[in-house]
Regions:
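Conserved PLP-enzyme active-site core in the AAT-like
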Residues: 1-180, 188
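Short hydrophobic/aromatic beta-strand micro-patches
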Residues: 90, 214-216
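Intrinsically disordered, low-complexity regions enriched in small/polar residues
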Residues: 106, 116, 121, 191, ...
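Conserved glycine-rich beta-strand-loop-beta hairpin in the small C-terminal domain of fold type I
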Residues: 172, 188-213
């Protein structure tokens, strides 16, 4: 996330098809400057995909900052108990696949396994990607939750808006305690004013990020 615009642009190759980042990276807890990365991705005609697992949509909405596709590991905060493995894909419908048809043949040429449909033509940019995910990729890969796992996830989602502020509050308290502990060498938590990503975190996550704290102890086991 610390790359300059020049470094970002230099990273793109002729076969680059997407840019990927994490809102808050695990485990380093670096914070993505979503607008900067979206600008770079779109300048090279590729979508920005953001993993928003740690903040969840309660604390950050990457699509509003330029992300095209957002992913979540629902096993963490959305589930709330780590009881059911799962994931989610959210498509903004903003990326124009057909405008770059030569780069995305899977979306812009007929899919013979699905009645010869060309997703970008049939569903437009608003539905091409997510329809391919649900109609073809889920069919071929089998990534469908069991009814019990879906039930557990739905229960967790009901309380997500209540739990996330508490997670942030607890994470902040733990981070501040560790930062002042003589046996701790370094603490990484975007909510600390001493953290290099503090201002970026406040921009994209004004209500806080998550409850995860990373630290380096002076105690060697």
């Amino acid at each position: 996330p610390d790359a300059s615009e020049e470094e970002l642009n230099a990273a793109f190759k002729h076969n680059t098809r997407a840019m990927f980042g994490e809102t808050i990276a695990n485990p380093a807890l670096t914070v993505l400057d979503i607008e900067k990365f979206a600008k770079a991705a779109h300048a090279h005609n590729v979508p920005l995909i953001v993993d928003n697992t740690f903040p969840t949509p309660i604390n950050c909405r990457p699509i509003e900052w330029g992300a095209d596709i957002v992913t979540h590991s629902t096993t963490k905060y959305m589930d709330g108990h780590g009881a059911a493995v799962g994931g989610a894909i959210v498509d903004s419908g903003n990326f124009d696949w057909m405008a770059h048809a030569d780069m995305y043949p899977g979306l812009c040429t007929p899919d013979e396994s699905y009645h010869g449909i060309t997703y970008a033509e049939k569903f437009g940019k608003e539905g091409a990607f997510i329809t391919k995910c649900t109609s073809q990729l889920m069919r071929d890969l089998g990534c469908i939750q069991s009814p019990q796992n879906a039930f557990i996830l739905n229960l967790g989602l009901e309380s997500l808006h209540v739990r996330m502020p508490r997670h942030v509050e607890n994470g902040q308290a733990v981070a501040e305690f560790l930062e002042n502990h003589p046996k701790v060498e370094y603490v990484s938590y975007p909510g600390l004013k001493s953290n290099k990503y503090y201002e970026t975190a406040k921009k994209y996550m004004p209500n806080g990020g998550c409850g995860v704290v990373s630290f380096l102890s002076l105690i060697h086991i």
